[in-house]
Amino acid sequence: MIEMEILRNTVQKIAKHAIEAIDKVDEAELEMMISKIMDASSVFIVGTGRSELIGKAFAMRLMHLGFKVHVVGDVTTPAIRDEDCLIAISGSGETKTVTLAAETSRSVGATVVAVTATPESTLTGYSDVVICIPSKTKEPWKYYTSGVLRGEYDDLTPMGTLFEDSTHLFLDGLIAEFMSILGKREKDLKERHAIIE
């Protein structure tokens, strides 16, 4: 019989890490992120793997709030323009598809917001705003090894788990900020919820 000790301990570690990581987010950068999203004609979101899934969840909630939002790679996604904003999610800041999207967006004059665990990376070099959520990522392993020796990381939260879960909670918290700014309530979001699924 499973005693759920591993599950409970892991969830507690993830939750504790997320709270501590989000507390370290630079408030000035956060205010700029909010401003850039509010001012954008359209918001584009890019990520790969689990970061993409978290980005899609954020895109859905932005849509529920009335923002014009697109996920990079979807067949209906239009060209990004200078009045738009790209939210680029990558723990390492080196994911090729994400850095290429950031570079391309920057080249046409769009605003780029990086959500990353790595403040100095290829991605942040293309970014106007950097939201750093300090966490272990799937790379580089040299930081992971030293972190394990200091007792900071655990094999039960593999690769990018801490970054991805912390980012998901951060972005859901950001949705609550937008709800407050826009004076929206849950019933307002429900009006835009899908009715054909």
UniProtKB/Swiss-Prot annotation:
Pfam families (UniProt xref): SIS
Membrane-crossing residue ranges in chain numbering: none
CDD domains recorded: SIS_PHI
Stored Gene3D superfamilies: Glucose-6-phosphate isomerase like protein, domain 1
Gene Ontology molecular function: carbohydrate derivative binding; isomerase activity
All residue ranges annotated as the SIS domain in the record: 33-184
Any GO BP annotation: carbohydrate derivative metabolic process
PANTHER family in the record: 3-HEXULOSE-6-PHOSPHATE ISOMERASE (PTHR43443:SF1)
The family this protein is said to belong to: Belongs to the SIS family. PHI subfamily.
Protein name as catalogued: Uncharacterized protein MTH_249
Organism: Methanothermobacter thermautotrophicus (strain ATCC 29096 / DSM 1053 / JCM 10044 / NBRC 100330 / Delta H) (Methanobacterium thermoautotrophicum)
